[in-house]
Amino acid sequence: MFFYLSKKIAVPNNVKLKCISWNKDQGFIACGGEDGLLKVLRLETQTDDSKLRGLAAPSNLSMNQNLEGHSGAVQVVTWNEQYQKLTTSDQNGLIIVWMLYKGSWYEEMINNRNKSVVRSMSWNADGQKICIVYEDGAVIVGSVDGNRIWGKDLKGIQLCHVTWSADSKILLFGMANGEIHIYDNQGNFIMKMKLNCLVNVTGAISIAGIHWYHGTEGYVEPDCPCLAICFDNGRCQIMRHENDQNPVLIDTGMYVVGIQWNHIGSVLAVAGSQKVVTQDKDINIVQFYTPFGEHLGTLKVPGKQMCSLSWEGGGLKIALAVDSFIYFANIRPDYKWGYCSNTVVYAYTRPDRPEYCVVFWDTKNSEKYVKYVKSLISITTCGDFCILATKADENHPQEENEMETFGATFVLVLCNSIGTPLDPKYIDLVPLFVAMTKTHVIAASKEAFYTWQYRVAKKLTALEINQITRSRKEGRERIYHVDDVPSGSVDGVFDYSKAIQGTRDPICAITASDKTLIVGRESGVIQRYSFPNVALIQKYSLDCRACQLSLNCNSSRLAIIDIAGVLTFFDLDTRVTDSTGQQVVGELLKLERKDVWDMKWAKDNPDLFAMMEKTRMYVFRNLDPEEPIQTSGYICNFEDLEIKSVLLDEILKDPEHPSKDYIMNFEIRSLRDSRALIEKVGIEDASQFIEDNPHPRLWRLLAEAALQKLDLYTAQQAFVRCKDYQGIKFVKLLGNLQSESMKQAEVIAYFGRFEDAERMYQDMDRRDLAIGLRMKLGDWFRVLQLLKTGSGDADDSLLEQANNAIGEYFADRQKWQNAVQYYVKGRNQERLAECYYMLEDYEGLETLANSLPENHKLLPEIAQMFVRVGMCEQAVSAFLKCNQPKAAVDTCVHLNQWNKAVELAKSHSMKEIGSLLARYASHLLEKNKTLDAIELYRKASYFFDAAKLMYKIADEEAKKRTKPLRVKKLYVLSALLIEQYHEQMKNAQRGKVKGKNSEATSALAGLLEEEVLSTTSRFTDNAWRGAEAYHFFILAQRQLYEGYVDTALKTALHLRDYEDIIPSVEIYSLLALCACASRAFGTCSKAFIKLESLETLSAEQKQQYEDLALEIFTKHTPKDNRKSELNSLLEGGEGKLPTCIATGSPIIEYQFWVCKVCKHYVLAQEISNYNFCPLCHSSVE
């Protein structure tokens, strides 16, 4: 960080100033002094010249108003920035609130206690409240509209300072005796503050300043110290909060008059005076510190006595009240920034996030990439890469085998130019100073430095990635103590214990090139090492403490900027004789410049460099300066006689919207002179000048000028001198052209004036060349336009190419509908298929598939598209069209179209369908999805397997004994599947014997085949038994409830044949009930005998049946009244009559109806009452 005095404003009549305050938002400067002096000034930057921005732009006083109202010396001035108010107070205790009206300041409110003098006033963070403290201990808190909120008298206490906390909940009162008391916002005392900085201090002390940064622009680090308290004896403490037990302690070694944080709380300015040992007087100085107590530098200020200081709102200037003058100093902050491959990388803090926001701004394409990085320490760049040095996250997993003794507390993150992290390296060394070359990163703490040979992904092989630990042993990572004398051997040990060994002479700066590493130490010693094999070559001794070091492109000279901003140069290899007559290596060059805050060597010339001195940029060639350029930019790059600089001050005013206007390009004098010579004198003289001052950029400039004049000889010579092979080829191409106008057109195109070149081609009637030019540029819209507008027929292949290229243009931007139109014209079926798919236009995709010839290479892709969206039929069609039946079957299986899969497998004689079905069915059964498995088998025409599973479900449901109708339906479904199985077997056999004797023969053979297979299951022979059992069971009960007791008994008697399906107890209980109702007590008696003999019943249940039987048969004789009618049912046997499935009665007539599906009978007179079979519910025809 550098600072220098830039402006001085005198107060009329030599009136001594007492206080100064700079409004952070609007830029007004209020200063108060003796005899009631109160002035409001405003410095405004002139922006007439767009090149001059920021600090480099001239500034004038746009306001200089004297405010009349105070009679005594004005001692306190404070701004309310939110409400544009100024509050001032004088030695008589008079307080005036001023307001801005039509560009001038006017009194708004006046208050005078007439008892005591105001010592301090402070507005809270949102500008709603002001706290005023008087010397006699009175405290008043008022609102912005002038109303008093509360007041308090602190008896026996002299107050001198007050400040609010960021959340307005705490007030700190500074006492005249040096104590600080903490109060809440209602004026209740909480506690005294512990002042660690005053330990062992004796004598009277007073508070010089209290400033609590409110975090309005974010914090440089989470939990960052922000409350600064400083005493007149120079002791200072910076606290994280009012109860911080471990504050940062500073002894400034000066008499302090005031302190203030900058706008983001990153720099604390401490103003006062210091005794000079050599002179018997005090000098005014401002010292700058970080929130962690690190000293950033000292600014010396002329004059007798400084009384106050105030920062500008952007932190780029500071105003100092000294005697009767206001001095302004410019600040050049140490921004965290870098420049790599057209990308400016910069970091800033935001109030809404604890991390740093790191922006990678591609200045070429105006694209921005943002990363959030916790505890960022620095940004270092080189080539196409950058290193972000940060503190390690405490809970972040470290690399395997990374740290054995020490926990890695810092990370070096290698990123590319868009912020993608490529390789993080965890180290246990504070990276205070980081340098980077094309192959290495060097990080240094105060005691040691670490080197890491980084590699980027394109160079890494899989083998190398797996050898991280070994590569470390081979020397990719090394660590050296600054006091060591390394020999350059690679057998050193990677040992972090070196990093914690102390040194009396700490490191203060480092720099490196591909072959040299320079380490600067606080004593002024410069150590030079060979690189990358680190060996100490030389030690040099200088009389300054380096702050910034830089090597030129051939590592022969070192530029040093010290902490006072003095730039010197050291020649590393020159041998000179010192004062003792000894020959030494290295010489300090005579050039010395003051107030320098940035410098950059040219990448391609060891004698060229650019430096920033105050608000001027100087370019030096062989230590001779060119005329300065007014700018305040930070130098990004110096190459090809051009300097690129970036106005970081302007960018960071609005970091989210960087503008290309803030990138400045400057040409050095030799480039400007060469251009002027070429334009005004001619190519020959310019050629001679460039010969005397050779540089590839100048030769290129000459070559381009010669090309424009078609001086091909000079152009070729110049291209040879700047080693531009493409340029040489282009000149040869021009030499082969006959027409001058053709040459001219080619040159115009070479310089990028494509519209003019095209016009010339068309004027020459060479539409083909115009089209060729546009094709090279990739301007296919114009190509298409030229093809269509020509008089002759357009080339079909070119038209297709243009249409396809435009299709690609739209497809890249995901404008699929537009792309389709051009792909259709370009007959690009592959891309057309993709567009249809992205548009979900499956009809178009199907039409495309149908239009393709068989075995076209695109068909499998289209089929896969259909598969992905579940369109089985279209996918199968496409697969079959390209002769991939296996893929078609797999698709059917994948989409659960098993019947289609079986059909395909059969038609293409594929054997694996059975195993596929079995595998999928077992998967469904494992998940207890039996019905899904049945459906699967049924769809695949595996009726027998489906029937087995359905029969199993019916059996399980029957065991529940709840819903007999549901059980009947399940048995019916099972039987129907068996019937379909029988039919399938017959049809299969018919197919086998086709062409044999007769249809009867084939039917018989089918039955025989079926008979063999049907022995595999007990239910295949009589599939309808279960359905019959539950049909009669339900029918009997329905008939009984409807009062047809005789019919119910006949039906119930059938149930005796189904004891294997329905429990005997239910059958005989129903039979006994029906027989009793029908007064067939003989049948009833037999049913009771059967019930009493059942072994499944408990003794208690048997007893209940016996009691019931006793009750019935004591009243009725166990004989059937109508025995003759029941004979046929009771006897059974071979001559058993068929049963009517509708009534349960035996069929004795010759005419009856037979169901075609289940083969059961119904009485002829009964069937007229039914539309469907009573058992299987098939249609009655």
Swiss-Prot record:
Subunit structure: Component of the IFT complex A (IFT-A) complex. IFT-A complex is divided into a core subcomplex composed of IFT122:IFT140:WDR19 which is associated with TULP3 and a peripheral subcomplex composed of IFT43:WDR35:TTC21B. Interacts directy with IFT122, ITF43 and TTC21B. Interacts with IFT43. Interacts with CFAP61.
Pfam families, alphabetized: Beta-prop_WDR35_2nd (PF23390), Beta-prop_WDR35_TULP_N (PF24797), TPR_IFT80_172 (PF23387), TPR_WDR35 (PF25170), Zf_2nd_IFT121 (PF23145)
GO BP annotations, alphabetical order: cellular response to leukemia inhibitory factor; cilium assembly; intraciliary retrograde transport; protein localization to cilium
WD repeats: 12-51, 69-108, 113-152, 154-193, 502-539
Subcellular location, record wording: Cytoplasm, Cytoskeleton, Microtubule organizing center, Centrosome; Cytoplasm, Cytoskeleton, Cilium axoneme; Cytoplasm, Cytoskeleton, Cilium basal body
Keyword flag Repeat: yes
UniProt name for this protein: WD repeat-containing protein 35
SMART domains given in the database record: WD40
Main localization category: cytoplasm
Keywords: Cell projection, Cilium, Cilium biogenesis/degradation, Cytoplasm, Cytoskeleton, Repeat, WD repeat
Gene Ontology CC terms: axoneme; centrosome; ciliary basal body; cilium; intraciliary transport particle A
Keyword Cytoplasm: yes
Main function: As a component of the IFT complex A (IFT-A), a complex required for retrograde ciliary transport and entry into cilia of G protein-coupled receptors (GPCRs), it is involved in ciliogenesis and ciliary protein trafficking. May promote CASP3 activation and TNF-stimulated apoptosis.
InterPro entries in alphabetical order: Beta-prop_WDR35_2nd, Beta-prop_WDR35_TULP_N, Ift122/121, TPR_IFT80_172_dom, WD40/YVTN_repeat-like_dom_sf, WD40_repeat_dom_sf, WD40_rpt, WDR35
